[in-house]
């Protein structure tokens, strides 16, 4: 179902969020995915037994990745889930504007997508080990999804950056500035 909603949007879009990395195209469809995820979340039924009013057959939300923005990579780095080379840390700390689609920007965003997918898979494995009932993703694949992980991490990053919350119990690195780029895709 996510493909059915995103498809017309992507087909009718006049431009794409694409870049080149090692001789191949990289497409990041953040806006299309957010469209589906926000519609799904905004109209989510009060009871899980009720069908979704916009996606009665299921939104296939589990097919979406995280949204590859600037905030989630920041918290993933803080949590030691992704690491940055010293050269990139220097760029971030200097608040240097990255060119849209450059190697650094694509690397940060792509690493975040991969990292959140790995977090999702680890969560599914832990749920399976903990309790047979928890291993299910849900009837519509939404119990443990990259979309919900993205929502949580984005909010967590803001709270940590603003000093409203701190991470305890695990080793973290100092929270770094977000990467900066001028783009309509964020």
Spans of features found by a protein language model:
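HhH-family (HhH-GPD) DNA N-glycosylase catalytic core used in base-excision repair
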Residues: 1-186
